């Protein structure tokens, strides 16, 4: 079992219940899923870019992504409706916990001049979205095999009702947020 899953069950959940005074254990926020989305603009011109992105996401997540298709045709981008322009993966369960652990403990510290992840990327439903600029920060991706550096979005979907609850959950799991002035 993943270290973060044990940490959540044994420590973080109890700390959140005390901090927010939940009357039921079912009210304690948890991470439902992690969605990784990569939009590949170069895929319009050359399918090889999409195939490379799919293989890299498969290495990073341990799960094969599904291709995302364009909803509308846009002539200026030479894009037709139904054309594959990206890939996405939804992680749940043990793969989700393994990915979060890799992201927080290995990948993010490898980012150049890393000062922490943004505090402002929460939505009103308690979800958090993080942009990764380079896929090469993950240890599963071999630098020499990468043809072009591309980024992707990582969305943490939580059961938290507010951004404050979601941030407390992610901080408890070890998310490296930026220090706000006045914080220790």
Curated annotation (Swiss-Prot):
Gene3D superfamilies: 3.30.1440.10
GO BP annotations, alphabetical order: translation
Keywords attached to this entry: Ribonucleoprotein, Ribosomal protein, RNA-binding, rRNA-binding, tRNA-binding
Highest taxon in the source lineage: Bacteria
Signal sequence annotation: none
InterPro entries: Ribosomal_uL5 (IPR002132), Ribosomal_uL5_bac-type (IPR020930), Ribosomal_uL5_C (IPR031309), Ribosomal_uL5_CS (IPR020929), Ribosomal_uL5_dom_sf (IPR022803), Ribosomal_uL5_N (IPR031310)
GO CC annotations on file: ribonucleoprotein complex; ribosome
Single GO MF descriptor: structural constituent of ribosome
Pfam families recorded: Ribosomal_L5 (PF00281), Ribosomal_L5_C (PF00673)
Family, per entry: Belongs to the universal ribosomal protein uL5 family.
PANTHER family for this protein: 60S RIBOSOMAL PROTEIN L11-RELATED
Subunit annotation: Part of the 50S ribosomal subunit; part of the 5S rRNA/L5/L18/L25 subcomplex. Contacts the 5S rRNA and the P site tRNA. Forms a bridge to the 30S subunit in the 70S ribosome.
NCBIfam families: PRK00010.1
Function according to Swiss-Prot or TrEMBL: This is one of the proteins that bind and probably mediate the attachment of the 5S RNA into the large ribosomal subunit, where it forms part of the central protuberance. In the 70S ribosome it contacts protein S13 of the 30S subunit (bridge B1b), connecting the 2 subunits; this bridge is implicated in subunit movement. Contacts the P site tRNA; the 5S rRNA and some of its associated proteins might help stabilize positioning of ribosome-bound tRNAs.
Protein name from the UniProt record: Large ribosomal subunit protein uL5
């Amino acid at each position: 079992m993943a270290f973060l899953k044990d940490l959540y069950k044994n420590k973080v959940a109890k700390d959140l219940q005390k901090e927010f005074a939940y009357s039921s254990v079912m009210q304690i926020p948890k991470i439902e899923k992690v969605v990784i989305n990569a939009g590949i603009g170069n895929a319009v011109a050359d399918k090889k870019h999409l195939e490379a992105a799919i293989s890299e996401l498969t290495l990073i997540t341990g799960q094969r992504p599904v291709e995302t298709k364009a909803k509308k045709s846009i002539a200026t981008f030479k894009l037709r409706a139904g054309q594959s322009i990206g890939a996405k993966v939804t992680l749940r369960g043990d793969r989700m916990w393994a990915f979060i652990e890799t992201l927080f403990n290995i990948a993010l510290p490898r980012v150049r001049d890393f000062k922490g992840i943004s505090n402002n990327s929460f939505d009103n439903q308690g979800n958090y979205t993080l942009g990764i600029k380079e896929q090469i920060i993950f240890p599963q991706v071999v630098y020499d095999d990468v043809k072009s550096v591309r980024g992707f979005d990582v969305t943490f979907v939580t059961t938290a009702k507010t951004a404050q609850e979601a941030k407390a959950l992610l901080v408890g799991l070890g998310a490296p947020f930026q220090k706000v002035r006045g914080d220790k």
